[in-house]
């Protein structure tokens, strides 16, 4: 039997105006956005709907904004939202957990806000960067990264075959980019990000978030969630918490996650939230599946 997977995007999909149409047309959306303003202690809706790109790009704003857009969109689907499985890319994992009933809306938002602030502090304490690498097999990239001496640099996002992101110390990432270009990478491009996400440089954030996650009540999700760290289905709350904590310093194994969902019967992938990045990645990983978006 064919199954439907709902997937939730991470940082990078944000744009000014996101969520405005939902707010204006759905009473439930308006109620949840206003609740979010109260929980966060500032009017995030003002920045989302009519702020500047610079305001929206602040990590403490971007992460809650993306979470809110995706989760509220999913909740507004009502009975139409019938996932057989869910997954989220990086930050999107929190959206997926709330949509699947493993976390309450309020607790999910508090954790995402905590995650954003902890990551911001880790970026300031341990400056780093990330770079997109295109046109080399994943194994080749990993092999070359092992030869880079001095500093931290690891494969951080396995997005789709031939497209991954590396993360680490600025100098080590720059040297890795040169080595990867020499090895035949079509592109090795530094990204405009605030730090070395999904690398050991995020350890202070992992410690801070671990405490908050352990203190939060999680529930068994209504369907399996395919988490970034193990890249397979997880149902138990203990495992979900452990993987959420590990995710901050571990790679996002998106390619393997999508492959696992397809192996378990997914033939239709619906991206919930701004943009269509995940639909593009899913099509590159599994060309035979159907994709659509709910923005």
Segments (PLM) and residue ranges:
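FabD-like malonyl-/acyl-CoA
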Residues: 2-141, 191, 268-294
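A short, flexible low-complexity segment enriched in Lys/Arg and Gly/Pro that occurs
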Residues: 65-70, 246-254
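Non-catalytic positions within long, well-ordered alpha-helices that form the structural scaffold/packing
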Residues: 78, 181, 262-265
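Alpha/beta catalytic cores of group-transfer enzymes, especially the acyltransferase/condensing modules
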Residues: 11-13, 40, 75, 100-250
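A short, acidic, amphipathic alpha-helical segment used as a generic capping/interface helix at domain edges
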Residues: 251-266
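NAD(P)-dependent dehydrogenase/reductase Rossmann-like domain
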Residues: 172-173, 212, 265, 288-294
């Amino acid at each position: 039997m064919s199954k439907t997977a709902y997937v939730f995007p991470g940082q990078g999909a944000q744009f000014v105006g996101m969520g405005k149409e939902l707010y204006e047309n759905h009473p439930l959306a308006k109620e949840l956005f206003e609740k979010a303003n109260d929980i966060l202690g500032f009017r995030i809706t003002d920045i989302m709907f009519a702020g500047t790109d610079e305001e929206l790009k602040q990590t403490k704003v971007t992460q809650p904004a993306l979470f809110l857009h995706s989760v509220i969109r999913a909740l507004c689907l009502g009975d139409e939202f019938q996932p057989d499985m869910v997954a989220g890319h990086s930050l999107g994992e929190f959206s997926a957990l709330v949509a699947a009933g493993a976390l309450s809306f309020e607790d999910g938002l508090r954790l995402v806000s905590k995650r954003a602030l902890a990551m911001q502090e880790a970026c300031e304490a341990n400056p780093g960067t990330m770079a997109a690498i295109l046109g080399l097999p994943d194994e080749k990239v990993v092999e070359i990264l092992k030869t880079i001496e001095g500093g931290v640099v690891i494969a951080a996002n396995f997005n789709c075959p031939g497209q991954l992101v590396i993360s680490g110390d600025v100098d080590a990432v720059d040297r890795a980019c040169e080595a990867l270009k020499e090895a035949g990478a079509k592109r090795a491009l530094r990204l405009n990000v605030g730090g070395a996400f999904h690398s050991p440089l995020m350890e202070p954030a992992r410690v801070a978030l671990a405490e908050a996650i352990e203190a939060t009540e999680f529930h068994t999700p209504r369907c399996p969630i395919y988490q970034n760290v193990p890249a397979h289905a997880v149902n138990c709350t203990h495992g979900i918490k452990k993987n959420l904590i590990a995710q901050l310093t571990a790679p996002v194994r998106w390619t393997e996650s999508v492959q696992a969902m397809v192996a378990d019967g997914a033939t239709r992938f619906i991206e919930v939230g701004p943009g269509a990045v995940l639909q593009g990645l899913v099509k590159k990983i599994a060309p035979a599946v159907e994709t659509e978006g709910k923005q």
